[in-house]
Amino acid sequence: MSSPARPFTVRAPASSANLGPGFDSLGLSVPLYTTLRVTPQDKAEVVPLGTELADTPADESNYVYRAMTLAAKRAGRTLPPARVEIETEVPLARGLGSSAAALVAGVVAGNELLGRPLDDETVLDVTAREEGHPDNVAPALFGGIVVATLDKLGTHYVRLDPPAHLGVTVLVPDFELSTSKARAVLPREYSRADTVHALSHAALLAAALAQGRLDLLRHAMQDYVHQVWRAPLVPGLSDILEHAHEYGALGAALSGAGPTVLCFHDQRGSTATLHHYLHDVMTKNGLSGRVMDFPIDAAGTVVEHAK
């Protein structure tokens, strides 16, 4: 017997996490999307589409489908069967939250199939616990800029509207860097000085973003917790962190675990000089890739039902 539920689409954005000192706690939403088209039917069917997903499973072991079952598990229900078509614009293993977009889209889709038994805060908690940190899933779910923590008591967050005129320029190199490899190079312990530096700059960055103090971004985005250790894995990163402001960037950071690098820019001005500089850095380091400008996505994950 077929399900009476209507088909629907879930669209979850990419994200850029850390933004320098906000390690595992601060991120923003980028308008590149993972899209699921879900059609309730008598049996489960998973259909990855496009070249980015050519190597992903076309069955219930697919990460998106497994994410859908997480919603059912949290709700104490069985996931209704459906055909799930998956497409993504988010480059994989580049530090733009491809796994978080897939996870959030899947949990939201599973929740939708079940009739929305989970509220947004529970969806956030499910996804943050699955990822192990909330800095990508929170902006993917809510859009904008999000400060979030994950602990035994739950997942807590504050969403910030993007400051007026703040845009992002991303350099996406044509090589992959796994999060596990990027985490493996980090030290097990940090000095008191580096800890204080991280705390103070993360707090300043959150406050600057909340109040639209674009003039403080370059200083607030300084970081000694992860970028200095990951720089050898991303040719040209140190150059960009030190010099991007000379070419119009308001601040620069490794995006998530990399290798993508994010620069903030003022949308009222031209980014041509910054683009030229970033392409020069890639050329100097024997890399190829793309440089793109984006606004910060404000909507987060969106569900649309067929009419």
UniProtKB/Swiss-Prot annotation:
Pfam families: GHMP_kinases_C (PF08544), GHMP_kinases_N (PF00288). InterPro entries: GHMP_kinase_C_dom, GHMP_kinase_C_sf, GHMP_kinase_N_dom, GHMP_knse_ATP-bd_CS, Homoserine_kinase, Ribosomal_Su5_D2-typ_SF, Ribsml_uS5_D2-typ_fold_subgr. Its EC number is 2.7.1.39. ATP binds at residues 91-101. GO terms for cellular component: cytoplasm. Pathway: Amino-acid biosynthesis; L-threonine biosynthesis; L-threonine from L-aspartate: step 4/5. It is an enzyme of class 2 (transferase). Disulfide bonds: none annotated. The keyword Kinase applies. One of its GO terms (molecular function) is homoserine kinase activity. It catalyses: L-homoserine + ATP = O-phospho-L-homoserine + ADP + H(+). One of its GO terms (biological process) is threonine biosynthetic process. It is found in: Cytoplasm. Keywords: Amino-acid biosynthesis, ATP-binding, Cytoplasm, Kinase, Nucleotide-binding, Threonine biosynthesis, Transferase. The keyword Nucleotide-binding applies. Belongs to the GHMP kinase family. Homoserine kinase subfamily. Catalyzes the ATP-dependent phosphorylation of L-homoserine to L-homoserine phosphate. HAMAP family: Homoser_kinase. This is Homoserine kinase.
